[in-house]
Amino acid sequence: MKGKLTAALLCAAFASSAAVIDGSYRIVVPKKRPLGVQNALEQAGKELASALKEGAGLDVEVVWSSDFKGAMRKSPVIFLGAGAAEKAGVMPADLKGFENMIVEKGGNLYLFGRDVQRFPKEKNPPWKKCVLPTVKAITRFMEKFLDVRFLGPGEVGKDIPKTTKVEVPDGCRDRHLPPIDYAPATGYSMLYGYAANAFGPGAYHSYGGHTYHKACPQEKYFKEHPEYFGLVNGRRTPVPLKNSTLCISNPKIEDLLLEELVARLDEGAAGVQLGQQDGRQWCQCAACKAYGGAAADTVGEKLWILHRRVAERVAKLRPGKIVNIISYSETATPPKTFREFPENVMIEVCHPTEARLKNWTENYKVPHGFVVYIYLWGNYPMPGLTAKRSYMRCAEMVRMFRRYGVHGIYRCGFGELFGTEGPAYYLFGRLIDEPEADVNAVVQEYCDRAYGPAAEPMREFHDTLDRRLMASDLMENPDSEFGSASPQNPLDLLAYIYTPEVAAKMDACLVRAEGLAETQKQKTRLALVRGEFDYARNLGKVAALYASYRFSPTELTFAPLADALEEREKILDAIYGGNDNPVGLPPKFPGWPEIALFGNNERRILVSNGRLRATIGSPLRWNVKMMRARGMLPGMSRESLEVPRTERVPSFGDFEGGEWAKCGWQTLNGIMSEKPMVEARFKLLAGSDCFYVAAESAMGKAPRIAGAGRDGPCGGEECFVMTVSPKDSSENYFRFMWNVDSKSRWDGRQGHITDPLDPKFGSIDSSWDGDWTVQSEFKNGLWRSMVALPYVTIGEQAPGKGVAWGFNVGRIADCAAKNSYRIFLLWNPNFESPRGITDPSSRGLIRFP
């Protein structure tokens, strides 16, 4: 704040006369720069010229410095970049990083900082790979002297009021040092990013949190060096398949991490991120268990020791460069075996809380201080892809960061809802520069500038929503000794936020605002709010009606719920332009191309409300059309079929003829009855000695057959899953899994250990190895397999007439799309868990005639 006041006073001191910008000015863009910087400054110069045109009606030409010659030099100029400032003698020798200046001298204006490209040899990097203090100076100039406000990305995101005069005080020297130098966030547009302090990693190289897969990619090393990868359940495991496990005690892993970091530093980065992968499985080899000594009794402590060693080696090889070590997941707890870090280390604290930052700053020596990685937004926190953060939470977070000297903020998942969360985004960015700014005044400014004559009803709209979000933020209370009071189910939270009363009030406000908007920009912003609100309001309705159905699952309660779900399907169709492809992306928002609706998430993610904690299975993934056609009440009925008998052993290969002709195919749907994304089906036969299963499924390409062996992690690969319960019980059943490799299979049984003192009592016994066979082949895009299960293996005789068993078949598939993900199919659906393919309570019934 002191820097901003100083700059303002310096300008005010010369306010008796001023440089008045008119049509004779030109904007001069430096030509001799790295291409990334050059392109960014050209774009910024054009946007500045456009703002002068829209706000003041001025036609200001943008020219390259190489073309600025002859008669042009007699006209006044707005110079961009450090070169012209140095020639004019207005560049301070100590200006560095994102520090920038606005200077008036002799009628000319200089907007500048020392712009650099993070990787100088990269031919044409995007703006986020550059340090562009000149762009920050341009946004500040537009805010200060044109009264522009950056409310969102792109032209629609700018509010540019009309003015009759643009003037800068003579001798103005406005110097500004942003409080952060590390600001990764979704890069919607450059000027918005700089205005909102979401300008990218700057001079630091960020992997987005995870380094290991870059240092030791499985496609490069696993075949020749499986010893680099974690030993899990007796098997070396490649990185992407099983939660990115590496053998950290192997000295080569430390070397590979070092090589990766040094390579990025040698490319030009001032600092580089070091962080482990996601995942909860770690190498179980004896050397890893002993790594770090007896005091290193957790995986996190071992990782801290490894990461410190890597940083020490970097310090020797590349003095002056920085290693940014992430404190995340296993390393969320600071190290206990040491308190001081090498001279080249800064720490990136994930999930920063008051208690965590206080502990770090008071008890540890970290020479380059702290940056934070925040999870305020994204598709994974509750309540999902609807508005999440209150004004209160934004203000508390930013002010806390300032108290603890945090100099960087990684905004994970930021920017998916520029309509309903617009004021919160604006507030967060503004408070970074001015943490003590009045929150109500900033929110009011947003509403005034975004909605014009519709500001009053829209302030009421946003405040009504904010009061619900504030209560949710207060319930979360991460530092409370009693833990969070927030609902653990996103449906419960959605039902609380969008009650009928709240939703009706918000809608009434929005209707009033839509009738008051005047300009096209205002109408476009309101259209975005409308789309996001209609989506959220429908979710609130679904949540309330689903609660009613669960209390009383009848046709009367199912009908309105089904109506709301069909309404939701229409909303999704509108968002995705009629594209029902699960991996389809939404088109750009009409009239606002910089907006990626709902964070540009694939349809499958929005269908489930988001990822991780935000995921909702039932009822959002129900196939309502199918349910209505079959008169089905979800959770109140089970799939069932009769199993034909045979005296002959059926053949493997021809599932249409021979004995298999006696039975029809049973189709697997999505795990919650939704339309399947992969085709899979099965048949059953009851022989005199064995129970037979024929299963086949489409596979778009040849599967990767690593082979898990007997009782290996079959579920990590393409597989079928079968549950057999002769007693039709959730406590007594057998489970079988098999892969494309017929030797790769798993089995276990539940309920057969009756001693309560046995460690395996109450859980599935995977040490049981039953006698059963699998035949399997992959050919022409089709995986076909046959299982023969002797009755004696499951302690049964050939079932007599009228006998019924609990039974289910599932399929785990890998999507072949660019963003690969797992697909879960099931014969008898699981309406409670979108991943509960092995849930024994979700079983159908097979009858033996």
Locate predicted features.
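Aromatic- and acid-rich polysaccharide-binding/catalytic face
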Residues: 337-354
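Feature activates predominantly on carbohydrate-active enzymes
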Residues: 43-47, 51-53, 95-308, 315-319, ...
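Structural preference for beta-rich elements and adjacent junctions enriched in aromatics
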Residues: 628-849
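Polysaccharide-binding and catalytic clefts of secreted carbohydrate-active enzymes
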Residues: 221-317, 322-337, 355, 428, ...
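Catalytic domains of carbohydrate-active enzymes that cleave complex glycans
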Residues: 431-637
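Acidic, contiguous N-terminal accessory segments
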Residues: 11, 17-99, 164-172
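Structured mid-domain segments that build the active-site/substrate or prosthetic-cofactor binding neighborhood
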Residues: 248-255, 349, 355-456, 460, ...
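Sec-dependent N-terminal signal peptides
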Residues: 4-14
